[in-house]
């Protein structure tokens, strides 16, 4: 038998089986040690063999102090060790789009969070100086809560409305260029525009999980390491900018923020005054849908007195949106763009195949001298005129008469095949849709 002091000498004098010494640890006074006394146990049966052990009641002593660790990603650093936030001397970080962030911060920045994830705007765009050009660094970003309050929009400003919800699992976004040399990071600004925010706690894509109606602060970390999963860290620096504080929402609450986002975000140009998603354009599209199809739109099919050439008679108002101010009244009939050939072309059918299913009956039909083709295994919902082959082609094995009207040679027996592809499964540029 061995005494624990002999087996574990590295534990130090703090781990003892005897009574704690009053002066051993000032943070653990003897009065508190009484509360941690073990319950009275039966007399050990091996006391005769361990006569040297102390018979005093066994108490718990204080644990030895733990060494200081670097701050974990996604957690607040310890205020007693501010030097741990910047262990890369000479490295500085500046916010490139500071003026844009200040403009949003003066109103109260809001960031949309969705289940699928939504990108931040404005995005964090920084420039770094003072790095070792030959060393490798990692750029990381995380988002931490600013305080322990939940906020609510009160018509003109945000006000605290209660205690914050429990903190969600912390996640860190790693810049896709990491790890890279210091010369690479200092060559141009570093953008975190791909960061996405979500409110789904079960998100499998690695997006940053946030609570709605809470105030958050992005942090940018710069870590010196040779590899992405390296265990040998050469230093770390964390940076925060007061202008980047925002409140996470599922829908914009402040109308001024909505206008700023539309004016500054290049991807929101459709919501501007003359954009496709402005109120005027949306109302015009609704009116066109309620008006229904124009009666003159189908009369252009099969007009045989038009000159030959490329035909695109199916491109109506649903594809090319016209100016709502020039839209015709419900009682007026607008003349559809006249085709330049005798019948619809292959491009027209590929764009709108459903438009030919109800084509009028006066379309040109198969020539009587053209015999019925053998069953090709699939039905042809369009007119038989589209199945005719040019004169002299040996596609069907029957003597073919000249077609009644000219048409583009895009259709073979049994249905359309994309050219120059010779087998089903090819893709066309029109809509990028597979034919089969």
Swiss-Prot record:
It is linked to Spondylocostal dysostosis 5: A rare condition of variable severity characterized by vertebral and costal anomalies. The main feature include dwarfism, vertebral fusion, hemivertebrae, posterior rib fusion, reduced rib number, and other rib malformations. SCDO5 inheritance can be autosomal dominant or recessive. T-box transcription factor that plays an essential role in the determination of the fate of axial stem cells: neural vs mesodermal. Acts in part by down-regulating, a specific enhancer (N1) of SOX2, to inhibit neural development. Seems to play also an essential role in left/right axis determination and acts through effects on Notch signaling around the node as well as through an effect on the morphology and motility of the nodal cilia. Expressed in fetal tail bud, posterior spinal tissue, intervertebral disk and testis. Also expressed in adult testis, kidney, lung, muscle and thymus. Keywords: Developmental protein, DNA-binding, Dwarfism, Nucleus, Transcription, Transcription regulation. Residues 271-284 have a biased composition (Basic and acidic residues). This is T-box transcription factor TBX6. Residues 271-339, 360-379 are annotated as: Disordered.
């Amino acid at each position: 038998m061995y005494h624990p002091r002999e087996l574990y000498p590295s534990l130090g004098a703090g781990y003892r089986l005897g009574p704690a010494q009053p002066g051993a640890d000032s943070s653990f006074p003897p009065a508190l040690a009484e509360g941690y006394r073990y319950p009275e146990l039966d007399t050990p049966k091996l006391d005769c063999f361990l006569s040297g052990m102390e018979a005093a009641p066994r108490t718990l002593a204080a644990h030895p102090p733990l060494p200081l660790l670097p701050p974990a990603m996604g957690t607040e650093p310890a205020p007693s060790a501010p030097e741990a936030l910047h262990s890369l001397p000479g490295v500085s970080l500046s916010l490139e789009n500071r003026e844009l962030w200040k403009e949003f911060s003066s109103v109260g920045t809001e960031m949309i969070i969705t289940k699928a994830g939504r990108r931040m705007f404005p995005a964090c765009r920084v420039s770094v100086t003072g790095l070792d050009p030959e060393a490798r660094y990692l750029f990381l970003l995380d988002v931490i809560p600013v305080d322990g309050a939940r906020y609510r929009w009160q018509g003109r400003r945000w006000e605290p409305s209660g205690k914050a919800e429990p903190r969600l699992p912390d996640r860190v976004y790693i810049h896709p260029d990491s790890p890279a040399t210091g010369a690479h990071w200092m060559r141009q600004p570093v953008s975190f525009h791909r960061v996405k925010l979500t409110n789904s706690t079960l998100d499998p894509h690695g997006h940053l999980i946030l609570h709605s109606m809470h105030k958050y602060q992005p942090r940018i970390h710069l870590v010196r390491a040779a590899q992405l999963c390296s265990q040998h860290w050469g230093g770390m620096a964390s940076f925060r900018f007061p202008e980047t504080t925002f409140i996470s929402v599922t829908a914009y609450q402040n109308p001024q923020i909505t206008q700023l986002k539309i004016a500054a975000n290049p991807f929101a140009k459709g919501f501007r005054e003359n954009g496709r998603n402005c109120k005027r354009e949306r109302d015009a599209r609704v009116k066109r849908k309620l008006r229904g199809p124009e009666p003159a739109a189908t009369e252009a099919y099969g007009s045989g007195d038009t000159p030959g050439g490329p035909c695109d008679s199916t491109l109506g108002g649903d594809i090319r949106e016209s100016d709502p101010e020039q839209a015709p009244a419900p009682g007026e009939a607008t003349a559809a763009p006249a085709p330049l050939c005798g019948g619809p072309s292959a491009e027209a059918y590929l764009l709108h195949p459903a438009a030919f299913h109800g084509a009028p009956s006066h379309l040109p039909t198969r020539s009587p001298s053209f015999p019925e083709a053998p069953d090709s295994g699939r039905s042809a919902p369009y007119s038989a005129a589209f199945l005719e082959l040019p004169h002299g082609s040996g596609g069907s094995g029957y003597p073919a008469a000249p077609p009644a009207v000219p048409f583009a040679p895009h259709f073979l027996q049994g249905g359309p095949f994309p050219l120059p592809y010779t087998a089903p499964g090819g893709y066309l540029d029109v809509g990028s849709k597979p034919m089969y």
